[in-house]
Design a protein with these regions (language model features):
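Exposed acidic/polar residues on beta-strands and adjacent loops within beta-sheet cores, strongest
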Residues: 1-155
């Protein structure tokens, strides 16, 4: 079963996968979690947008690298509403998901380290993630996904 669908300039338009949401202007592509995640009566979907790390200096530090941000949308009619964004992979900040460093083919598009739970989702980091932690939990609070411990930054 296909869980993450490529979208963007080469992968096709966003409307076919997440109607009502367009990529950020600087995004070079995206992966859409095709699953709908429920928290209470609300439904959510994750969109992973890919950006160049150092677009203004492609020969410099991380010039060929990428930054990936997870955008979480509340699937509210008539248009999805963004409820959070988290940096999940970064050449510049040396942050990455555990699943993207598993050494398997296509692991760069493996977002299985984002695990949805009853009140939000947990991210398992490769090595030490933001703030030196190995995992971070984000919960839905007052309409936004926020870290559940103050030591975990919402990057």
């Amino acid at each position: 079963m296909l869980i993450w669908t490529a979208a963007g300039p080469e992968g096709g338009g966003m409307d076919a996968v997440l109607d009502g949401v367009t990529l950020a202007a600087a995004a070079t592509g995206a992966f859409v979690d095709t699953r709908v995640h429920r928290i209470g009566k609300k439904r959510f979907r994750a969109l992973y947008q890919v950006f160049d790390s150092n677009a203004s200096n492609p020969m410099g530090h991380c010039g060929a690298g990428h930054e990936i941000r997870m955008f979480v949308y509340d699937l509210t009619s008539p248009k999805p509403i963004e409820r959070g964004r988290i940096l999940v992979s970064s050449c510049l900040e040396s942050v990455s998901l555990a699943s993207q460093n598993a050494g398997r083919p296509y692991s760069e598009s493996d977002f299985s380290s984002v695990i949805w739970r009853g009140d939000g989702f947990t991210i398992e980091w490769w090595g030490n993630g933001p703030g030196g932690v190995t995992s971070s939990h984000y919960a839905l609070r007052n309409g936004r996904f926020v870290p559940t411990r103050s030591s975990e930054g919402n990057r």
